[in-house]
């Protein structure tokens, strides 16, 4: 049995009519709208009313409670970009921007103060920079490209963190949504890239005072511990979702001890992420890093609470003692 549906924009402007099987899904409807009216599938948000919520692609049309009989509403989400592309740009930017302040200190801090630097060649961490580093620094008034121990090791750990994120995007993450509005690319990149410049300026500053040795090693341990924990959670979440599907299951710990945090929070990947930046704060002794950690905690808490609520709504047997992101607190 076929359904005759009136397709209307959420603004109230009619688009046209679609004839489709009553057993068809929202995904099928999107494809028909694309065929007939050339509105890209990824740009469509199908709703049961002008102010209704976005219907899932797997939802059958005949099971939707339409506000107006035989009428569906479409919101154009605008130009889209792939999630993987967004993540690659988000995470590659901080490596290159941090590297710029690391490799060209004379251009940002002046030449004379850098003569007090000691120890390590900046090229060791960022060998992929194709620019004539020594020549550019000479133009800016100096030639010595040596950095103090704290900045050197912080640069290594910074690169490990964002390099890990890039590799996870390529080989680990499975996205429930293929695309996102292209506007979000500028918003997300502004956040990551802006903080990369802000942190790099302070951590690499020749007058930056490194923390005590014991605090540095404590910070390194916390950072690396949380990086491994974060990766462990991402691998577990990948294994929960079969490739090519949007299946959702209750995440529970596996044999990896780092996943035991699922006993306490719904989004332990965010917990570990925050922990990494607490560790980076300690190992650098840099207050701007702590500001970045708190900014990240705020945003991740918003995301975690949203995901936590979805889990509890979707799964009646969801563990009641779990918090969203911080054990026993939030």
What is the predicted role of each segment?
Residues 100-104, 208-330:
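Hydrophobic transmembrane alpha-helices
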Residues 10-28, 53-56:
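Short, contiguous acidic and Ser/Thr-rich linear segments
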Residues 107-133, 241-248, 315-320:
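Interhelical loop segments of eukaryotic multi-pass membrane proteins
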Residues 72-82, 117-149, 209-215, 248-258:
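Juxtamembrane membrane-interface segments at transmembrane-helix boundaries in membrane proteins
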Residues 151, 155-180, 196-206:
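Internal transmembrane alpha-helix with an interfacial aromatic "cap," most often the third helix
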Residues 19-48, 69:
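Short amphipathic, charge-patterned alpha-helical segments
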Residues 81-98, 148-161, 179-192, 210-223, ...:
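Transmembrane alpha-helices of multi-pass eukaryotic membrane proteins
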Residues 23, 50-75:
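Eukaryotic mixed-charge, acidic/polar low-complexity intrinsically disordered regions
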């Amino acid at each position: 049995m076929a359904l005759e549906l009136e397709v209307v924009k959420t603004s109230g402007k009619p688009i046209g009519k679609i004839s489709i099987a009553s057993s068809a899904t929202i995904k099928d409807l999107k494809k028909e709208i694309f065929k007939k009216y050339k509105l890209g599938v990824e740009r469509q948000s199908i709703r049961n009313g002008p102010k209704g919520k976005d219907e899932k692609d797997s939802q059958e049309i005949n099971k939707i409670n339409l506000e107006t009989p035989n009428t569906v509403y479409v919101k154009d989400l605008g130009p889209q970009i792939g999630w993987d592309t967004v993540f690659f740009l988000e995470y590659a930017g901080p490596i290159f921007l941090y590297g710029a302040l690391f490799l060209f200190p004379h251009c940002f801090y002046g030449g004379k103060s850098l003569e007090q630097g000691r120890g390590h060649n900046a090229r060791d961490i960022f060998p992929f920079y194709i620019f004539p580093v020594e020549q550019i620094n000479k133009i800016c008034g100096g030639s010595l490209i040596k950095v103090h121990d704290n900045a050197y090791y912080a640069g290594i750990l910074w690169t490990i963190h964002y390099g890990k994120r890039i590799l996870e995007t390529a080989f680990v993450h499975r996205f429930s949504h293929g695309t996102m509005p292209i506007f979000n690319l500028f918003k997300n990149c502004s956040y990551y890239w802006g903080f990369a410049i802000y942190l790099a300026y302070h951590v690499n500053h020749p007058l930056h005072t490194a923390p005590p040795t014991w605090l540095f090693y404590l910070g390194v341990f916390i950072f690396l511990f949380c990086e491994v924990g974060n990766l462990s959670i991402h691998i577990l979440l990948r294994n929960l979702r079969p490739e090519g599907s949007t299946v959702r299951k209750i995440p529970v710990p596996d044999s990896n001890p780092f996943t035991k945090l699922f006993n306490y929070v719904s989004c332990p990947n965010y917990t570990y992420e925050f922990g990494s930046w607490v560790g980076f704060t300690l190992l650098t002794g840099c207050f701007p890093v702590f500001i970045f950690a708190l900014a990240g905690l705020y945003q991740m808490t918003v995301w975690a609470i949203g995901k936590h609520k979805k889990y509890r709504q979707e799964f009646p047997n969801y563990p009641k003692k779990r918090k969203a992101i911080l054990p026993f607190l939030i």
